Design a protein with these regions (language model features):
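PEST-like low-complexity, intrinsically disordered acidic/proline/serine-rich tracts
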Residues: 20-243
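Bacterial N-terminal signal peptides
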Residues: 6-15
C-alpha cells in the first residue's frame, strides 16, 4: 500500500512540475528554451541540406590545361572550392504562432540588455497578439560556407510572389493545398523570408480539428526546395490550436 501511495505521489509531483514548467512566462525563458522553440518544437523545424559536390574538387588542378573538363569547372576554378561538404540549415517556422514570436522577442531581450520600457512593451504586444487573418511561415538560412550560403541567399532575396505562387503551398493530410498569397524577402529584422497564406478558405479555417498534419512546400527551382511536415495535435496552446 505504501509503495502504491509513493508511486501516486511521485506521479502527482511530476504532473505539478510539468504544469508549472508549461506555465513559465516567455519573458523568463532562457536562451536554450527560446532556441528550442525556434529550432525544434511543434511550430518550428530545421531542414538540413548537405552538399558534397565540393569534396572531390582539386583547386590546384586547372581543367583548362589538364585535358578533360569537369562540369561547371570554369566557374568552380574561378570561385574556388571548399574541398569539403557544405551544410545549409533552413529554419522553417510558423511565425503567426505566438510561441515563435515570443521566442524571437525573448532572444532579442537576452541579447540587448538595455531596452527602453516602451520598446519592451511593444515587443510584448507583438509577441502576445493572436494571429488574425493570415498564416505566416518564415524561413531563415544559415550555412558553414559563405560561398554556398551567398548563392542560396541570392536566390531567396531575389524571389518574388509571382515566381513562387504556383510552387509554394500548404498541404493538408487530405491532399487539399493552399497556395501562396504573398512572398516577402528577408529583411534586417532577422525573422527571415515570409510566406503568407490566407487563414480562411471559403469562410472556414484552412486548418481545423479534422486536419491531422500540414506540409509546407516552397520550390525555388534547382537551387532550393523546402519540404517540412507539422503535426497539428502538437501545435496546441492553452487547449487551442495555435498556428
Amino acid at each position: 500500500m505504501k509503495t502504491i501511495f509513493a508511486l501516486l505521489l511521485g506521479v502527482a509531483l511530476v504532473t505539478v512540475s510539468l504544469a508549472q514548467k508549461e506555465k513559465k512566462p516567455w519573458t523568463e525563458w532562457s536562451e536554450k528554451e527560446a532556441q528550442k522553440i525556434l529550432n525544434d518544437s511543434p511550430w518550428s523545424q530545421v531542414q538540413k541540406d548537405v552538399d558534397t559536390t565540393e569534396m572531390f574538387f582539386q583547386p590546384t588542378a586547372d581543367p583548362r590545361t589538364a585535358g578533360a573538363r569537369a562540369p561547371n569547372s570554369n566557374e568552380r576554378l574561378q570561385q574556388g572550392a571548399t574541398n569539403q561538404a557544405t551544410n545549409l540549415n533552413y529554419g522553417v517556422r510558423f511565425f503567426s504562432a505566438r510561441p515563435v514570436r515570443q521566442a524571437f522577442m525573448r532572444m532579442i531581450q537576452l541579447q540587448q540588455k538595455k531596452l527602453e520600457p516602451e520598446v519592451i512593451e511593444r515587443m510584448k504586444n507583438f509577441a502576445e497578439m493572436p494571429a488574425s487573418d493570415a498564416i505566416i511561415i518564415t524561413v531563415t538560412v544559415e550555412g558553414t560556407d559563405k560561398r554556398s550560403l551567398g548563392a542560396v541567399m541570392q536566390v531567396v532575396e531575389s524571389a518574388a510572389t509571382g515566381t513562387l505562387k504556383n510552387t509554394s503551398y500548404l498541404e493538408r493530410n487530405d491532399g487539399k493545398r493552399l497556395f501562396l498569397q504573398e512572398y516577402v524577402p528577408p529583411g534586417r529584422d532577422g525573422f527571415g523570408a515570409r510566406f503568407i497564406f490566407p487563414r480562411m478558405v471559403e469562410e472556414q479555417p484552412f486548418l481545423g480539428p479534422e486536419v491531422t498534419d500540414v506540409r509546407f512546400v516552397a520550390d525555388f527551382g534547382k537551387t532550393l526546395k523546402l519540404n517540412r511536415r507539422f503535426k497539428l495535435a502538437d501545435m496546441m496552446l492553452d487547449g487551442k490550436l495555435e498556428y
